[in-house]
Amino acid sequence: MSVRYPLLNRELGILGFNERVLAQAADPQVPLLERLRFICITSSNLDEFFEVRMAGLQEQIRDNPGALTPDGMSLQHAYDLVVERAQRLVHRQYTMLHETVLPALEQEGIYFHASDSWNDEQLEWARRYFLDELLPVLTPIGLDPAHPFPRVLNKSLNFVVELEGRDAFGRQAVMGIVQAPRALPRVVRMPHALSGFEHGFVLLSSFMQRFVGELFPQLVVKSCNQFRITRNSELFVDEDEITNLRVALQGELPARHLGNAVRLEVSADTPLHIVRRLLEESELGDKDCYRVAGSVNLVRLMQIPDLVDRPDLKFTPFTASTPAVIANAPTMFDAIDAGDILLHHPYESFQPVLELLQQAARDPSVVAIKQTIYRTGTDSPLMDALMEAARNGKEVTVVVELLARFDEETNINWASQLEAVGAHVVYGVVGHKCHAKMMLIVRRVVQAGKASLRRYVHLGTGNYHPRTARLYTDFGLMTADQKICEDVHHVFQQLTGIGGELTLHELWQSPFTLHPRIIESIRAEIDNAQAGKRARIVAKMNALLEPSVIAALYEASQAGVKVDLIVRGVCALKPGVPGLSENITVRSIVGRFLEHHRIYYFHAGGAEDVYLSSADWMDRNLFRRVEVAFPIRERKLKRRVIAEGLSVCLGDNQSAWQMHSDGHYRRRRTGKTIRNAQLGLLAKFCS
């Protein structure tokens, strides 16, 4: 593939984002237990990176080794660069954990007891715990011709045990494998009286390394080392052949745990000949092995902040606010009738969204509810409200995206429950994930003695997920605007029925009008700049990768348009290149909350067009998903979006990272006045 304009590598960009996340763990301004949490978040992110992106890169190398990446590199060269950077990131992560965070936790009375440090009383307690709580659940597998190497599950914790001696059948014992069931706790609290610390913990791996011999009686344990294999987790569903997507997915999900191996993690002290055996059994090369100084699964340490009652070592709790127009209105419908409502999560509560749906479920005047679901969690009051509405006789239609990655099983379960109470459940459009966030309520109202149907809509940039609504930054709009409601009705009509493309008047929708409208809006700014008028583009999103949009932004810069991009994650555009992109800046905000809203601002000759959306500027969002972008017309709300979503990020000099033309980021901590976008909004909205 020839590249007309320069692009940056996607995989390297994802690793760059995770480097910025890990930097939070090194920041002394971040509370200590939150620093530990950021180390764990980095591990979780890397797991998905290997399961999806690295797995895909390995497949491309196998299938088409001569191909190039979108940024023009050979696949093998790109893979080598990504592996090298990933290895550095993992090394930095474990160094930070062991040399900075764990010693600081020990100073605060939070300690992890390694097995080689146990005194006699601690040893006896640990032995009893192993025999009573762990041993009955563990299954040792001895390796011999009758017991081949097991195909260990994706991301499971395993132990490879080197043995010596003969077993009860006279067989020479060489090696055994023990897989730790997911039900076993990875972290166990040691009784306070034994620990000597306020909060003492023992890792499951410490129990195993000390007592694994109990699983192999009368044999000598020469070594016991933990390992973990990450597998390709993409689901393979032939969308052209299936007749029932849910049934096809249910058949495919179990295979996710047994896909091709893409990464081997082993403890640093694992003997080389054992590492070789593990790589051979996994069909991996030396570059795919990550030797780590400690636990091979740091994600499980994420529970420590929840187990330790030390508010002084965590982010200050906050109570999200509720807009006065909602608090003072008899019902959510009355509040929306008074005018459009903008909610800015997590600073403003997600509860009004739940209340809107709950009131709709119980209101005898409501006749129909339509809802999209992408991610909502396993325990969702929103889904409970939809089922209540169906039981109450409402016409409930839910578009459940079954292919939401890693939420497929949860969404299948919700779809079954919804159908059981009489709701209409559809799975969107085969070949196009439904990522749009839409709720439509149809209510019978009486005005001046005349009955009519009135529509109410909620549109959002984030998922209908109460838990992540406290962790992600997102905007939501509640409106009864007739044009927007009509457009949302048409989108639902497309999702649930069959027919031609319907004309939308206010919304931009992918895969139809969203990409053309973005390009047209950029072109309009170019025209204004060339005519000597003011021209400006500000856009905020999670990722920027789509080549034609990037090309248009480069052309805008060359025409003199000032372009400010706030891209949390990967960005393939190179800013600040003379003659190409010197008028473009790119920054990334990484802080307490995950920046998640997508905002498109175009100066538009002074009209200032502002759109909110669920769509990043990526190929998949613009061409292979159903997404919507919706306008903010009301002046006061528009000023809020510009101020709270864009200006605070552009002015941030604490959690902002500035991207340079080589693709590297540097923390932007300049100026005498401290400006932190998220902390400023917390202070403005929350108590």
Curated annotation (Swiss-Prot):
Pfam families tied to this protein: PP_kinase, PP_kinase_C, PP_kinase_C_1, PP_kinase_N
Top class in the EC scheme: transferase
Catalytic activity: [phosphate](n) + ATP = [phosphate](n+1) + ADP
SUPFAM superfamilies the UniProt entry points to: Phospholipase D/nuclease, PHP14-like, PPK N-terminal domain-like
Positions annotated to bind Mg(2+): R375, R405
EC number: 2.7.4.1
Domain of life: Bacteria
GO molecular function: ATP binding; metal ion binding; polyphosphate kinase activity
GO biological process, one term: polyphosphate biosynthetic process
Post-translational modification comment from the UniProt entry: An intermediate of this reaction is the autophosphorylated ppk in which a phosphate is covalently linked to a histidine residue through a N-P bond.
InterPro entries: PP_kinase (IPR003414), PP_kinase_C_1 (IPR041108), PP_kinase_middle (IPR024953), PP_kinase_middle_dom_sf (IPR036830), PPK_C_dom2 (IPR025200), PPK_N_dom (IPR025198), PPK_N_dom_sf (IPR036832)
Cofactor: Mg(2+)
Active site: H435
Family the entry assigns: Belongs to the polyphosphate kinase 1 (PPK1) family.
Protein task: Catalyzes the reversible transfer of the terminal phosphate of ATP to form a long-chain polyphosphate (polyP).
PANTHER family cross-referenced by the UniProt entry: POLYPHOSPHATE KINASE
Stated name of the protein: Polyphosphate kinase
Organism: Burkholderia cenocepacia (strain HI2424)
Top-level taxonomy: Bacteria, Pseudomonadati, Pseudomonadota, Betaproteobacteria, Burkholderiales
